[in-house]
From Swiss-Prot:
The protein's name: Orotate phosphoribosyltransferase
S-S bridge residues: none
Gene3D superfamilies per the UniProt record, alphabetical: 3.40.50.2020
Gene name as annotated: pyrE
EC number of the protein: 2.4.2.10
Enzyme class name: transferase
Residues at which 5-phospho-alpha-D-ribose 1-diphosphate binds: 93-94, 97, 99, 119-127
This protein's UniProt keywords: Glycosyltransferase, Magnesium, Pyrimidine biosynthesis, Transferase
Oligomeric form and interacting partners: Homodimer.
Species for this entry: Pyrococcus horikoshii (strain ATCC 700860 / DSM 12428 / JCM 9974 / NBRC 100139 / OT-3)
Pathway entry: Pyrimidine metabolism; UMP biosynthesis via de novo pathway; UMP from orotate: step 1/2
Length: 186
């Protein structure tokens, strides 16, 4: 079984597709929710995700020297990828710390760093765009944004409009097809 198919099966079998009424981070309302956070506590799933991102980045000849993820959902993914690639980790906070060092980025970000940014789920891409812009403001070059699941609700277009390259591992349409769910059911 291909790793991507294995990931899709894990997402389905771990019950990550939930139905009901949900308000997403983007503020949009939805009748389904992709709960990747329950998946990214699974070491097997994290290994698969990290290997898929690493392989795809290699296929694309992406040159990067650091891995970043916005808190909270992307941190385990970024950590797994950091371990898989042996590249340093950066964590982009949702907001600047009010205490201690007051950092918005944890880790050593420097001007000219080539950063691979990861995210768990994208809808409009707002959260990951914000993280990418913060990295850019600190002198980093975001060479690619990888997401585990893209809901196909504008993230690709919004991210690319901001000048970033976007690489989803799985599209929600692929998940629904594999789970035997029609878009109308969702």
């Amino acid at each position: 079984m291909k790793m991507k198919d294995e990931l899709i099966n894990l997402i389905i079998n771990e019950g990550c597709i939930k139905f009901g009424h949900f308000v997403l981070t983007s503020g949009k309302e939805s009748n389904y929710y992709i709960d990747i956070k329950s998946l990214i506590t699974n070491p097997k799933a994290l290994r698969i995700i990290a290997k898929l991102i690493k392989e795809k980045a290699e296929e694309l000849n992406l040159n990067y020297d650091k891995i970043a993820g916005p808190e909270l959902g992307a941190v385990p993914i970024a950590t797994a990828l950091s371990l898989e690639t042996n590249k340093p980790l950066l964590i982009v906070r949702k907001k600047k710390k009010e205490h201690g060092t007051g950092k918005v980025i944890e880790g050593n970000v420097q001007k000219g760093d080539k950063v691979l940014l990861v995210e768990d789920v994208t809808t409009t891409g707002g959260s990951v765009i914000r993280a990418a812009k913060i990295l850019r403001e600190h002198g980093a070059d975001v060479v690619g944004i990888f997401v585990v699941v893209d809901r196909e609700e504008g993230a690709k277009e919004n991210i690319e409009k901001e000048g970033f390259k976007f690489y989803p591992l799985v599209l929600v349409s692929e998940l629904f097809k594999a789970a035997g769910i029609s878009k109308d059911q969702s």
